Amino acid sequence: MRDIKAMLPEEIAAALAEMGQPKYRAKQIFQWLARGVTSFDEMTNLSKDLRAALSERFFISKLEMLRKQVSAIDGTIKYLWQLGDGNAVETVVMHYKHGNTVCISSQVGCRQGCAFCASTIGGLIRNLEPSEMLDEVLYSERESGSKISNIVLMGIGEPLDNFDNVMRFLALVNHPDGENIGMRHISLSTCGLIERFDDLAARDLQLTLSVSLHAPDDATRSKIMPANHGRGVAALIDACARYYEATGRRISFEYAMIDGVNDTPEHAKLLAKHARRVCAHVNLIPLNHVEERAFRPSTPEHLKAFIRILERAGVNVTVRRKLGSDVDASCGQLRKKVADHRA
């Protein structure tokens, strides 16, 4: 059976044509799926015979909510979803003045091994399907009662390590007959799988590419991000430059401030050099505490000094607002906690 929620309208139309059904039915079905229906019987403008025929050929992906945590501080919501095979992923809904943002996962686990991240503990289990990523958006919207206006692929997993499925998810969530979320309202985060940068640039998508840099030199970056081995910061910055030249889209450098690791004035000066070269925005991230990791966030004094150096160098810099600190909102924390409890 085929996963119909992972199909675009033209693909549904082609399948319907083989069943002797008119093309316009594809749009109806796609719109029903975008509303989050879980069975063909809910598609009330289709005949019973067609609904039965669809049930024999296709399945509709579903999620089951295992946990929901709501921050008493800022209303951030964290969901833990169970997938059809029993695995679990996390999704976070964040409320801003400009709208509601959902942070989705792209993989079950992660193999990139970043030393400060909870998502990599336990490694990669599997890639998420396009329909499962779409479900993260649809189910979060339904359960929270909040219309989602922005998507960030910054949850569990490395999106570029699941390239084809992520590209199809983007086509689905961007489709005007579906969620219709514009590409300019979508950010994709990567730890730097530079072999995929040119492929992404060739798609000419208007999304924001956020590069999880976290250190401006090989010595520091290789210690905390194994993905740097065999690539290197120089090659990563070169890839960013090519991406910027090809797309005209400004890149964001994500930079978790880690006490005594990557927060010295020398780090700030080198980061400024890289950012100026590719016209990148720098987003500094106060490090989230992870029980299994020994790292601590930079002190407020070090953070302020770091910002001053970047600003004096002419770099556009912001500090990420810390949301959901009381609900395990750092990606991977809730999933691991529940998995440990089950074990």
Predicted segments, located by residue:
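Conserved alpha-helical substructure of the radical SAM core
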Residues: T120-N150
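Short linear Ser/Thr-Pro motifs
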Residues: S71, S105-S106, S119, S189, ...
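Helix-turn-helix/homeodomain-like alpha-helical modules used for DNA recognition
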Residues: Y79-S105
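Auxiliary Fe-S-binding modules of radical SAM enzymes
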Residues: M1-V89, A241-R250, Y255-A343
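Canonical Radical SAM [4Fe-4S] cluster-binding loop centered on the CxxxCxxC motif
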Residues: H95-E132
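Conserved AdoMet/S-adenosylmethionine-binding subsite of the radical SAM
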Residues: E141-N150, G155-A313, V317
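A generic beta-sheet turn/junction motif
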Residues: A72, G84, H95-K97, G192, ...
